[in-house]
């Protein structure tokens, strides 16, 4: 059985490892970075493609290589990719699974310092209006910096990025100096987040509601301990998705996969 996996997340690595341990399957994983492809290969993916793929090219690959199922395990905020993948599966009449990581359980967490917004533009305006006196930690990826920089001076802006050429080029283009860049991979621990808040004398942190696997709880707890604000961008809602195609953990994924092909 051949699986076309849209990856680039920790979820996708977990999926690769689970499938290779439990099923007889060939997996092609697509990511937007060489780093993501490297992790997918290490996780057991048989093939990787490390570049953004337009819809027509994905369709061509799936048709030419006879893939049996399309799994979308991209980031919750990669809404356009999920919309595209669902459209492709519908067009090709092929099995489709969307792995949607659970939202963060904040039941026992102090959320009084969280300001929820629906977009990065809204986040930038909020900072300009209410948090313009201190420094800003941007823990929401290189692709979203431009919306914030419109409202925040570069000298007050400290983004956490992957140290890859595309991210470094974006920073240079936006005028963000190298000594403001926080190069890290993986979710930061509570201690690491506290250290970054202290080091850069931040008054506010920007993050996405990317789930526990994205380190959201550690960010909130660090902000609480250091008494700074958090601006949380809410997840986009994708209306095109059929709820029956969504799974949120490996057990649910297993049930779906079992309906398509047998375990080893």
Residue ranges and their predicted role:
Residues 172-195, 200, 204, 209-226, ...:
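A C-terminal functional module that forms or caps the active site or interfaces directly
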Residues 68-69, 135, 203-204:
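Structural motif
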């Amino acid at each position: 059985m051949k699986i076309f996996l849209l990856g680039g997340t920790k979820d996708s690595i977990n999926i690769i490892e689970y499938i290779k341990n439990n099923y007889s399957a060939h997996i092609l994983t697509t990511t937007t970075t060489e780093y993501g492809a490297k992790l997918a290969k290490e996780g057991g993916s048989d093939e990787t493609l490390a570049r953004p793929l337009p819809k027509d090219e994905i369709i061509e690959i799936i048709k030419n290589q006879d893939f049996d199922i399309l799994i979308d395990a991209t980031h919750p905020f990669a809404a356009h990719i999920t919309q595209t993948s669902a459209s492709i599966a519908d067009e090709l009449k092929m099995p489709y699974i969307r792995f949607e990581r659970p939202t963060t359980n904040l039941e026992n967490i102090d959320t009084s310092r969280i300001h929820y917004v629906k977009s990065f533009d809204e986040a930038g305006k909020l900072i300009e209006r209410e948090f313009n006196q201190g420094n800003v930690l941007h823990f929401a990826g290189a692709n979203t910096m431009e919306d914030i920089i419109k409202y925040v001076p570069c000298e007050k802006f400290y983004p956490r990025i992957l140290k890859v050429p595309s991210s470094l080029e974006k920073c240079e283009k936006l005028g963000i100096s190298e000594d403001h860049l926080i190069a890290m991979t993986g979710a930061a621990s509570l201690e690491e987040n506290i250290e970054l808040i202290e080091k850069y004398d931040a008054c506010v942190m920007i993050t996405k509601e990317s789930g526990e696997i994205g380190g959201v709880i550690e960010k909130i707890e660090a902000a609480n301990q250091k008494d700074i604000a958090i601006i949380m961008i809410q997840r986009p809602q994708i209306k095109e998705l059929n709820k029956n195609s969504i799974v949120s953990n490996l057990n649910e994924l297993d049930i779906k996969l079992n309906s398509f092909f047998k375990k080893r």
